[in-house]
């Protein structure tokens, strides 16, 4: 479902930097906006209201399907875990449990059903492994993201070939973390 929504509705593949820049602020707002965090979460949820359709295999999808919305959230959570693992020496089991509990509080701010949310860090690990093993599909959107290039902004005064060479390691690192 997530791949179909990205393919049909997102500008991520056309304007990756702009899409990320527009998303980071509100997503971080759900974590750091204090008393306004639940309002920010509701705003993000509203952004997804009209993201629906039928995928290439004839299956209906909607971004507000609780399983789909939680999976997207779970990928942000695992990005934090993997970034700490790859670049900061990892987290202790106690820190992973704490971060899991915090990610549940973060997710609650969206006002979505809590049904798909695992009850513990251990259940989350089982959930993550199961979804990665049994549910993920190599959709056209996922394939496009694998080969995405970050276009050079007009104001950058360097040749395009140099820009592309500069960002190849960055895009490669992004894929490595996501894997």
Which residues make up each language-model segment?
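Mature, function-bearing regions of proteins
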Residues: 1-179
């Amino acid at each position: 479902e997530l791949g179909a929504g990205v393919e049909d509705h997102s500008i991520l593949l056309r304007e990756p930097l702009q899409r990320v820049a527009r998303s980071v602020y509100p997503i971080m707002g759900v974590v750091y906006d204090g008393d306004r965090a639940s309002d920010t979460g509701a705003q993000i949820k509203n952004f997804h209201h009209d993201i629906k359709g039928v995928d290439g295999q004839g299956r209906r999808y909607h971004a507000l399907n609780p399983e789909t919305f939680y999976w997207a959230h779970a990928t942000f959570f695992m990005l934090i875990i993997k970034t700490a693992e790859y670049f900061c020496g990892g987290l202790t089991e106690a820190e992973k449990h704490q971060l899991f509990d915090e990610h549940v509080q973060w997710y609650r701010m969206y006002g979505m059903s809590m049904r798909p949310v695992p009850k513990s860090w251990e259940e989350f690990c089982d959930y993550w492994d199961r979804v990665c093993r049994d549910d993920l599909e190599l959709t056209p959107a996922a394939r496009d993201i694998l080969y995405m290039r970050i276009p050079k902004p007009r104001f950058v005064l360097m040749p395009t070939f140099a820009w592309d060479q500069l960002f190849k390691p960055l895009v490669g690192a992004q894929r490595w973390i996501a894997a």
